[in-house]
């Protein structure tokens, strides 16, 4: 997996298909993720794959929880979060039932050697669980890496004890703080890319914290920041600070998100386009009218640059959506790209996983088809998205 990432452009970003969690009928799979350190990252992977994330449990949604959560396993209604990681790693949609959490799964595993002894088989697994150290699962590893990324204030934090004691108190895993520290230092440090997690100091705010730690190690290594943060709200405030402090970094991430969405196998792919948020007040020209556009007009439109007030307004809207849905910048910009920069459609998509008009979201393959000079392909797109949405997509791509 690491070798495949070396061939890509960004090992820290999602690389799986944008339709991984889209059903054959074009509808998006809906997921509910229980609060955990990995929730934000899982949400990013799900949304990048075309799925949707519910803020509360909804009918028809796939309920996700980390293995070892007593309430989730007792109900039998939850699917392991490992399902998302495995789907992303293999880049294919796997069978849900194979990842269902429940007391029966542990009992079946422990009683395979003695299928006939019900009374003895039911009693034996419990002593075996506590006879030695509890094995680390992939979900545990993700929780550790995510917790370090979101709570470590300096490189020296991971070698101290305060960080790990705080993680043990949070009850995110069943392991002691000594085991958590040992697991990270000996097996996980530097392996973030294998779990599709970036290194901690990747954002401007993280860089600022790192510089502050070098200037004042004692203040950076204090336990106070850990006490002020909660696992249910990972880095929300830090994302806001990052955008406010460095708008250039935001613009760069917008371009990166665009490139990620627009990347195709052919060499004739068009130049990167910026996100233009529109309220859809005016109806765009139809595909037929658009085809009559003069070349000179197209060149003039391409040469137009976005003004600073427009950039500021776009950043403000994106920040509001990030705060409203508790998502990262890349996920929100991807949603805008998939909805042709339409604010209303993007908001509806982030809230419910569907556009308000009932049409599907745009994928990279749809954009490739849109570039083809083929009447049948264009008619198929009009049938799929509606003539007005196709016209809006054409206008959006020009910008």
Curated annotation (Swiss-Prot):
<dbReference type="Pfam" id="PF16589">
    <property type="entry name" value="BRCT_2"/>
</dbReference>
<dbReference type="GO" id="GO:0005737">
    <property type="term" value="C:cytoplasm"/>
</dbReference>
<feature type="cross-link" description="Glycyl lysine isopeptide (Lys-Gly) (interchain with G-Cter in SUMO2)">
    <location>
        <position position="212"/>
    </location>
</feature>
<feature type="modified residue" description="Phosphoserine">
    <location>
        <position position="154"/>
    </location>
</feature>
<feature type="region of interest" description="Disordered">
    <location>
        <begin position="264"/>
        <end position="311"/>
    </location>
</feature>
<dbReference type="GO" id="GO:0005654">
    <property type="term" value="C:nucleoplasm"/>
</dbReference>
<feature type="compositionally biased region" description="Low complexity">
    <location>
        <begin position="112"/>
        <end position="125"/>
    </location>
</feature>
<dbReference type="GO" id="GO:0032205">
    <property type="term" value="P:negative regulation of telomere maintenance"/>
</dbReference>
<keyword id="KW-1017">Isopeptide bond</keyword>
<dbReference type="GO" id="GO:0019902">
    <property type="term" value="F:phosphatase binding"/>
</dbReference>
<keyword id="KW-0805">Transcription regulation</keyword>
<feature type="region of interest" description="Disordered">
    <location>
        <begin position="196"/>
        <end position="244"/>
    </location>
</feature>
<dbReference type="GO" id="GO:0001933">
    <property type="term" value="P:negative regulation of protein phosphorylation"/>
</dbReference>
<dbReference type="GO" id="GO:0010833">
    <property type="term" value="P:telomere maintenance via telomere lengthening"/>
</dbReference>
<feature type="cross-link" description="Glycyl lysine isopeptide (Lys-Gly) (interchain with G-Cter in SUMO2)">
    <location>
        <position position="372"/>
    </location>
</feature>
<keyword id="KW-0804">Transcription</keyword>
<feature type="region of interest" description="Disordered">
    <location>
        <begin position="104"/>
        <end position="132"/>
    </location>
</feature>
<dbReference type="GO" id="GO:0070198">
    <property type="term" value="P:protein localization to chromosome, telomeric region"/>
</dbReference>
<dbReference type="GO" id="GO:0016233">
    <property type="term" value="P:telomere capping"/>
</dbReference>
<dbReference type="GO" id="GO:0042162">
    <property type="term" value="F:telomeric DNA binding"/>
</dbReference>
<feature type="cross-link" description="Glycyl lysine isopeptide (Lys-Gly) (interchain with G-Cter in SUMO2)">
    <location>
        <position position="114"/>
    </location>
</feature>
<dbReference type="GO" id="GO:0005634">
    <property type="term" value="C:nucleus"/>
</dbReference>
<feature type="modified residue" description="Phosphoserine">
    <location>
        <position position="36"/>
    </location>
</feature>
<dbReference type="GO" id="GO:0032204">
    <property type="term" value="P:regulation of telomere maintenance"/>
</dbReference>
<dbReference type="GO" id="GO:0035556">
    <property type="term" value="P:intracellular signal transduction"/>
</dbReference>
<feature type="modified residue" description="N-acetylalanine">
    <location>
        <position position="2"/>
    </location>
</feature>
<dbReference type="GO" id="GO:0001673">
    <property type="term" value="C:male germ cell nucleus"/>
</dbReference>
<feature type="short sequence motif" description="Nuclear localization signal">
    <location>
        <begin position="383"/>
        <end position="399"/>
    </location>
</feature>
<dbReference type="GO" id="GO:0043123">
    <property type="term" value="P:positive regulation of canonical NF-kappaB signal transduction"/>
</dbReference>
<feature type="compositionally biased region" description="Acidic residues">
    <location>
        <begin position="280"/>
        <end position="304"/>
    </location>
</feature>
<keyword id="KW-0539">Nucleus</keyword>
<keyword id="KW-0007">Acetylation</keyword>
<dbReference type="InterPro" id="IPR001357">
    <property type="entry name" value="BRCT_dom"/>
</dbReference>
<dbReference type="GO" id="GO:0032206">
    <property type="term" value="P:positive regulation of telomere maintenance"/>
</dbReference>
<dbReference type="InterPro" id="IPR021661">
    <property type="entry name" value="Rap1_C"/>
</dbReference>
<feature type="cross-link" description="Glycyl lysine isopeptide (Lys-Gly) (interchain with G-Cter in SUMO2)">
    <location>
        <position position="208"/>
    </location>
</feature>
<feature type="domain" description="Myb-like">
    <location>
        <begin position="128"/>
        <end position="188"/>
    </location>
</feature>
<dbReference type="GO" id="GO:0000781">
    <property type="term" value="C:chromosome, telomeric region"/>
</dbReference>
<keyword id="KW-0963">Cytoplasm</keyword>
<protein>
    <recommendedName>
        <fullName>Telomeric repeat-binding factor 2-interacting protein 1</fullName>
    </recommendedName>
</protein>
<dbReference type="InterPro" id="IPR009057">
    <property type="entry name" value="Homeodomain-like_sf"/>
</dbReference>
<feature type="modified residue" description="Phosphoserine">
    <location>
        <position position="43"/>
    </location>
</feature>
């Amino acid at each position: 997996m690491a070798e495949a990432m070396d061939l890509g452009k960004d090992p820290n970003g999602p690389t799986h298909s944008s339709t991984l969690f889209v059903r054959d009928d074009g509808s998006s799979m809906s997921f509910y993720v229980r609060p955990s350190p990995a929730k934000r990252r899982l949400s990013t992977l799900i949304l990048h794959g075309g799925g949707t994330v519910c803020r509360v449990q909804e009918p028809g949604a796939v309920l996700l929880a980390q293995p070892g959560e007593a309430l989730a396993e007792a109900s039998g209604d939850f699917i392991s979060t490992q399902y998302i990681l495995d789907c992303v790693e293999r880049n294919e949609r796997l069978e849900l039932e194979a990842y269902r959490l429940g007391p029966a799964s542990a009992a079946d595993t422990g009683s395979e050697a003695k299928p006939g002894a019900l009374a003895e088989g039911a009693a034996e697994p419990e002593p075996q669980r506590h006879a030695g150290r509890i094995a680390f699962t992939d979900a545990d590893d993700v929780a550790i890496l995510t917790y370090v990324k979101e709570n470590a204030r300096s490189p020296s934090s991971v070698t101290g004890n305060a960080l790990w004691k705080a993680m043990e108190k949070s009850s995110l895993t069943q392991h002691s703080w000594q085991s958590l520290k040992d697991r990270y230092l000996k097996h996980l440090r530097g392996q973030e890319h294998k779990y599709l997690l970036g290194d901690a100091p990747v954002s401007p705010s993280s860089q600022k914290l790192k510089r502050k730690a070098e200037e004042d190690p004692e203040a950076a290594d204090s336990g106070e920041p850990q006490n002020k943060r909660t696992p249910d709200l990972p880095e929300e405030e830090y994302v806001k600070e990052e955008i406010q402090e460095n708008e250039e970094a935001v613009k760069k991430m917008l371009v990166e998100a665009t490139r990620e969405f627009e990347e195709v196998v052919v060499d004739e792919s068009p130049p990167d386009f910026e996100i233009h948020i529109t309220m859809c007040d005016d109806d765009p020209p139809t595909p037929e009218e658009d085809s009559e556009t003069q070349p000179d007009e197209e060149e003039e439109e391409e040469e137009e640059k976005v003004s600073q007030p427009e950039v500021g307004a776009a950043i403000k809207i994106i920040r509001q959506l990030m705060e409203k849905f508790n998502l990262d910048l890349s996920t929100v910009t991807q949603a805008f790209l998939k909805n042709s920069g339409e604010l209303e459609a993007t908001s509806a998509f982030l809230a419910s996983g569907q556009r308000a008009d009932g049409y599907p979201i745009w994928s990279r393959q749809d954009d490739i088809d849109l570039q083809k000079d083929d009447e049948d392909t264009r008619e198929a797109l009009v049938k799929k998205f509606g003539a007005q949405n196709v016209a809006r997509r054409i206008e959006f791509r020009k910008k």
